[in-house]
Amino acid sequence: MKALLFAAALTASTASMAEELRIFNWLEYIPDEVIQQFEEEYDAKVIYDTYDAAEKMETQMLTGASGYDLVFPGSSNLGRLIDSGALEKVDTSKLTNIGNIEPEFMQILRDIGDKDNQYAVPYLWGTNIIGYNQARVKAATGKDALTSWDDIFSVESMKALEQCGVAMMDSPTEIMPLILFHLGLDPYSTKAADYKKAEEFMAELRPYIRYFNSSQFVEDLANGEICAVIGWSGSLFIAQSIAKGTNNGNDIRMVMPEEGTMVWFDNMAIPKGAPHKELAEKFINFILRPEVIAIASNSIGYANPNSKATPLVNKEIKSNPAMYIPEEDMKKLFAQESLSLRTEKIRTRAWTNIKTNR
């Protein structure tokens, strides 16, 4: 009996000694299978906290002493976090799998603020595109497909689509650049006048938009509650998968508008003063394994920048031109960028005015 009690106590003690890795990330953005595999292999315990807006993560990082070991900043705020000193340099000498990342993605990181590739490692990437219910859109508009930003950003189209429901993500970071792009303006303009033009343009469309929400649209599109949405490519893939999986009769399609769109990147980074920096670097290197990042792509529905992982990604994902963009369409993409805090305030104010139609 004493031996059994001693063994039980030893097991409990060993479990309690497992090193903790505190991650701050989007909800369900790392598959449980991946986390469990890492915990078992490295005798670690992952604490996974979530946020529902990139702005919340950024605010948390800028306050300092967050207590987190790993965060996932996007291309919209990575530059500001680096400039503010909120991130630690990653010891790339410990990332034996870093060579799996396609060079063009490392170049994009340099272009958006990580000039020497010292602070961030690419995780997943995607685009902001149009998702729609083919039958309901045809019934409302007479069109077989939505192919252009004109199919969303025009009063005529929105009036027709209002009857079946149009939604947009609730994020100035994700939608405002698309509005400016459609208007022929710099998607990352620093001019207050350009954001005023966007406000005035959207004032005509606002009455026909059912809601702004960055998560509700997935279920609603899948179930036929709405018929069109501007959303993240991976979220639209999930909506499509739900509709197919439940066999509910909704033919959900996703398309990159013919004019082009914004491409974004979520990255792995280590907060300043992270308690377990070395374990965070082990996790980053673990994610860079082709077989691991492929699990993430197959589960979450987003493309990854790991060239060796592509053969392991499900065919329905890697053959989808709205997710793994064909080379000839890549030139139509513009990368998501950071804005100065001053311009970010202007953009956010304009977005609030659009939503409230003031």
At which residue positions do the language-model features occur?
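Early extracytoplasmic/lumenal segment of secretory-pathway proteins
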Residues: 19-81
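Mature extracytoplasmic/periplasmic domains
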Residues: 271-332
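Conserved C-terminal helix/tail region of periplasmic/extracytoplasmic solute-binding proteins
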Residues: 219, 327-358
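Periplasmic-binding protein-like
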Residues: 195-204, 210, 248-269
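Extracytoplasmic ligand-binding site segments that recognize negatively charged/polar headgroups
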Residues: 78, 82-208, 220-222
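N-terminal signal peptide c-region/cleavage motif recognized by signal peptidases
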Residues: 13-16
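A bilobed periplasmic-binding-protein/Venus flytrap-type ligand-binding module shared by bacterial periplasmic
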Residues: 131-136, 181-184, 264-276, 295
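A ligand-binding cleft/hinge motif common to bilobed small-molecule-binding domains
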Residues: 77-80, 228-249
